[in-house]
Design a protein with these regions (language model features):
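Catalytic core of pol beta-like nucleotidyltransferases
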Residues: 1-21, 29-35, 45-104
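Short beta-strand->loop micro-motif that forms the acidic, two-metal-ion catalytic signature
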Residues: 40-44
């Protein structure tokens, strides 16, 4: 089950970032979180959306003031994600074990 705070964060990221997909992964996706856990989000961005580092900075800025729990955000372009999700990578873990919370 996705927490209310995770839903709020994913909605804000969807509106501000315009991703192709948003995954929640890690302990919150596996329902094994504890008091010190953070949210882990993977944003699959359109291939023409620009530099991943700059996109990450924008994503973190968009969440200022709306979250209580720490958040980690990973940005990847769609073509890379689609290739890497079948290899032993973070993308495979996200694809297999993550929760797809948004898809365009």
């Amino acid at each position: 089950m996705i927490t209310e705070e995770a839903r709020l964060i994913s909605d804000k990221l969807r509106l501000e970032m315009n991703p192709v997909k948003i995954y929640l992964f890690g302990s919150y996706a596996k329902n094994t979180y504890h008091a010190d856990s953070d949210y882990d989000f993977y944003l699959v961005m359109p291939d023409d959306s620009g530099n991943e580092i700059l996109l990450g900075q924008k994503a973190y800025r968009s969440l200022r003031g709306i979250r209580k729990t720490p958040v980690d955000i990973v940005i990847g372009h769609e073509s890379s994600f689609e290739t890497l999700k079948f290899q032993p990578t973070l993308e495979r873990e996200v694809f297999r074990d993550g929760v797809l919370v948004y898809e365009k």
